[in-house]
Regions:
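Gly/His-enriched, cation/cofactor- and phosphate-binding structural elements
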Residues: 1-112
């Protein structure tokens, strides 16, 4: 969970991970302002259509795009958004859910 003022950190983390040895594609995402998922994808693999992947990840409730090797996506959490009453325990469980869901979505779309 990060504030909208710190959302640039998502891209910074994705850029940093791409610089690691043997990493050709990196993905970083976060719950931003408690009401949306924002993600950043970086890839040195020209065969991976990052802008298309980001657009698909944004889906009908968000958006996404990019250019060769770089992209971002977002979508609203709707009724699952943090209304300010989530305690740390619930936030931890919610993050576990979001993390697992995003990883499954990414793997499914990349294997297409």
């Amino acid at each position: 969970f990060i504030s909208g003022g710190n959302r640039d950190l998502i891209a910074v983390v994705a850029d940093e991970m791409l610089s690691w040895e043997n990493v050709e594609t990196s993905v970083a995402f976060a719950v931003v302002d408690g009401n949306r998922i924002e993600g950043s994808i970086r890839s040195s693999n020209a065969a991976l259509a990052v802008p298309t992947l980001c657009k698909e990840l944004g889906g009908q409730f968000g958006g996404g795009g990019g250019k060769l090797g770089k992209g971002a996506y977002y979508y609203d959490l709707g009724s699952c958004a943090d209304d300010g009453e989530m305690d740390d325990s619930i936030k931890d469980k919610f993050w576990e859910f979001v993390n697992e869901r995003e990883l499954k979505r990414l793997l499914k779309m990349i294997k297409m």
